Amino acid sequence: MKTSAAVALKSPFLKQNWRPVEKESDAWKFVCLTKDNIPDDLPNGTFVRTGPNPYDLSEINPKSYHFFSGDGMVHGVKINNENVLYKNQYVRTGNITKNNNLAGRGNTAMVYHNGSLYACDEGSRPYELKFDTLQTIRQQDFNGLLKHTFSAHPKVCPNTKELHFIGYGRHDVPNSDAFTHYSVVDKNGMLLKTVPINYRRPTPLIHDMAITENHAIFMDFPLYDMAGPTKIEDKTMFGILPRNAMDESEMIWIESKGMYGFHVANAWETFDEENSSILINLLMVTSLNFHFQRSNISGLRLRHFIFDLKTKKEVSCNVVSDVSMDFPIIDNRKVSKRTRYIYGSRLTTKISLPLPIDGLTRYDIETGETIEIDFPEGVYGGECQFVPKQYNKGTADTGLSNEDGEGYLLVLCYTEAKDQSQLFIYDALSMSKRPISIINMPARIPYGFHALWIYAEDENNFGNIDKLIPPLSIRSKL
């Protein structure tokens, strides 16, 4: 990374632990022994997280720079029977490699599908990474069939193993000039279909979507320009489309009050003789006093929506937790299905910091209770991942717990006073405020965006692709 201290001092997105690191690693670095540091029933696997880490600060205008545009860097913490290991790598985007054919940053979210690991953002197709090194293999276009961008939050259906996503861009769809499309990739990595989505207003900012077992849900928020302070004055629309639809003729649009939300927690459906409903949980703000250059989104609240598919109307839209949070996550095995717990990262107004997270939360859908975990004083973090406990680990009779909440929450944190990054592990069922483990990392890890847990069994399914996007001409070693 090429540094410029003057630029860093002028941008809030380059200060404190948002400042980029100057080194990446060529090999997995030893962190600690697994024994006595990691719970015995935590499955083997790797915690990966991407985030912005600008490569050349001399090219940045500090007045306009926002962390959404920072070059993606992926950090990995690998846990096996013997050791905990750490590695970081830049995503080899066009901005870094100076290849104009490679768009985007790969700095927003991670997804695993069909033996491939992807770094994603809204502005491009996903970057495929070589799992054992985290090096960039290619920008995936699914055999040339994907013409539009790939959203930051694709959904993997646990039943069909299909990958569902939405994105911007024109596409070769007859009789359509839509700028937004919904696509599905099957369990074998083949693009099955692309469906145009014609929004009724200017194309909104689209960051996430939802799926149930039979439907895909698209949000049409009244937010189009994030260059300055933004007000929400129009209605929100939810588009609900059967997952087996080949065009948008079966789309149902349901109206709700004006609001905005970046992230979906989960959605599911209920069908009986009297009702046919979609239920969805999102983090929303209703009066968006949001300024893009400050990322002051402390007003986010978890809302529970119910939509009646027969009447095509909203049944209810209720705030279910009064805790300000972001980055909602669930047990990923329950995407599209009813889930009991929604975990989140608690936002604080105590410090002046973009996305200031000072704890974790758990909302219980059955009881309506929200439990909070406070990070230690002066410690801030990011998105957590839920990892179920593994019973009979190391035996032929091993497996993952299916009990709601029986597992661990893993989150990367940063202790300001020590300038030290750490992996915190909490008990997801008890939600004890005391972490089970705190693992000191061998390098500072800047704050970032979304994370992913990959099981060791899935790691073994990664393809052995040796052709990589060329490395940086100037690289620092960890």
Please place each PLM-identified region on the residue numbering.
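Beta-propeller domains
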Residues: 1-478
